């Protein structure tokens, strides 16, 4: 067994020395010479010179005419005039939405009934910020999202 471990140790050392030269980092930019980079830069400059600018290809007036024609062809809906801030009588009375007009007495009666219901609710429901319950263990509940303290008066 001693000879086997000696052979394995020497084999591992041999592999370590052989692979040492191959494990160096080879950056990508190291394989490209400066001359090649300059050639690429010159080629890019020549291509940019040959490519016309967008403004030179089509004047802005032609672009705006073309865009209006395309908009008209693409939008099947008629254009809606801008809102002037005036409300017609049907909208003012709530007729446009199918609702009748509410007078102030109806509104105040509704608000009063909601406030009474809120005040009539138990104090624990009004002031605890609970939104659910959670089962910690079988038979043991704890409040989920509830305040950890109680209000005292």
UniProtKB/Swiss-Prot annotation:
GO molecular function: hormone activity; hormone receptor binding; neuropeptide hormone activity; neuropeptide receptor binding
Record SMART domains: NAT_PEP
Region feature (Important for degradation of atrial natriuretic peptide by IDE): 147-151
Keyword field contains Secreted: yes
Region (Disordered): 54-105
Pfam family, one: ANP
Any one Gene Ontology cellular component term annotated for this protein: protein-containing complex
Leader sequence residues: 1-25
Post-translational modification: The precursor molecule is proteolytically cleaved by CORIN at Arg-123 to produce the atrial natriuretic peptide. Undergoes further proteolytic cleavage by unknown proteases to give rise to long-acting natriuretic peptide, vessel dilator and kaliuretic peptide. Additional processing gives rise to the auriculin and atriopeptin peptides. In the kidneys, alternative processing by an unknown protease results in the peptide urodilatin.
Residues making up the propeptide: 26-123, 93-103
Keywords of the record: Cell projection, Disulfide bond, Hormone, Phosphoprotein, Secreted, Signal, Vasoactive, Vasodilator
Residue positions where Phosphoserine is found in the record: 129
S-S pairs: 130-146
Matches recorded under PROSITE patterns: NATRIURETIC_PEPTIDE (PS00263)
GO biological process, one term: positive regulation of potassium ion export across plasma membrane
Source domain of life: Eukaryota
InterPro entries reported in the protein's UniProt record: Natr_peptide, Natr_peptide_CS, Natriuretic_peptide, Natriuretic_peptide_atrial
Residues flagged as site, Cleavage: 123-124, 130-131
Record-stated family: Belongs to the natriuretic peptide family.
PANTHER family assigned to the protein according to its UniProt record, in alphabetical order: ATRIAL NATRIURETIC FACTOR PRECURSOR, NATRIURETIC PEPTIDES A
Name of this chain's protein: Natriuretic peptides A
Taxonomic source organism: Equus caballus (Horse)
